[in-house]
Amino acid sequence: MATNKSGLNPENYASVVDGKKTALYVLTNKQGAEMCVCNYGGIIVSLMMPDRDGKLDNVVLGLSNIEDMKKRVDPYLGAAIGRYGNRIANGKFTINGVEYTLPQNDNTNCLHGGLSGFESKVWDAEQTDEQTLVLRYTSVDGEEGFPGNLDIVMTYKLTDENEVCIDYKATTDKPTLCNLTNHSFFNLNGISGKAEAPVITNNVLTLNCDKFIPVDAIAIPVGVKTPVEGTPFDFRQPALVADRIDDNDTQIKYGSGIDHSFCINQKNEGEMTLAAVCECPATGRVLSTYTTEPGLQVYSGNFLNGTVGVGGTVFQRRSGICFEAQHHPDCINQPKFEQCILNPGETYSQTTVYAFSVK
């Protein structure tokens, strides 16, 4: 029986995976917004946010039960991503002269931490109040080929200002890579009760980014940061997504749309900065993404292909858009990019805020 505004049945998310219990956690705020999270993968399953008329609707893509999650039916929908969000070329990297080899699960690349990344792990969960969920996971030395025991604390908070705040902290006992993010697919049209999720091509996007990261045919950076001026990646002024994602530009063709990392215009390293504003004129919903990270992977849902999700809604191609705050792809093998090596005695710290409003 549903006990939440999203219409989700908590029993559908209750299971035991690798000896750990999974459950659905419901966060609410004073404005009536609601976020449902499963501790399997730290997955944001649903997010009820108001439109300009105050009507609540689910604005993220999620799966309707734990079994689909375990079967890896679109495994990254709403999930926590690690140890390394995005791609590492050839599944190889070197730290302090030691080469490490990772699974190649995306062409010859290692994508999102390997064959079994954080999206498929059961996190220890503690709901500290109506608005806050604390998730903990220890990635053991050698997991998916990464060195060091990595202890992660990830905190989800739904504020009274309709912000989804995700705070990450991590420590290690060996030099390792740490590049965490969230892979929510947003749909500001709202998907509740719809047979098919509407496409997000009617959204208007603005990016606080003067440069982006061009890639090769298998999505590995070519090693430079390129000005967006004169390219379909120039969102410094508001632009309709539909006008850009089918451009004849080679980079657009490589990604079958937008699937690129953008360089956020940060004044100081690690400073919380507005990275993106996405607006849906049809509903009035506005999503503003703030982060302490240097990069924002924008993905226009080009490879969504008919997965049936929450409420029986079909997720068609381009029915969600991702704003994945992180370090740039393959940065460990790209000397011109900001690095994400974490050493013993240091604390990895990252905060991303998805702030919702209406206009």
Regions found by a protein language model. Give the residues of each.
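An exposed, glycine/acidic-rich loop-and-rim segment of catalytic or binding clefts
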Residues: 2-359
